[in-house]
Amino acid sequence: MASERKELGKIQKCHFGQGGYQDACIGVTFTLGGDSWGVGDFWGAWAIERSDRAKWTEADRITQLGEMVMRLNSLLANAKVSTVDALQGIPVEVTFDGMALESWRVLKEVL
């Protein structure tokens, strides 16, 4: 059974644009890290043209993108910044389950 651990670090890089799986998505890419660790995270949806074989619909994509923008808006508010590029250097607490990223949050307590 994997063990949960928390690490303190910062948002080292972040950008809005193409990213995710083989850069086939549109959204926000984050690089989070500390003294001896680093991890990437991506919030977004497929940017490629939908095929008839896709297991998602245009409505699904629009919903995912809307949810991502609202999540990003909340992150900006918690970090007390107004742009994605201003997130760089913001302190975070990251939770891992074994080696897998489970979640992360802005350390509002130290801002």
Which residue ranges define each predicted feature?
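Short beta-rich binding modules
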Residues: 1-111
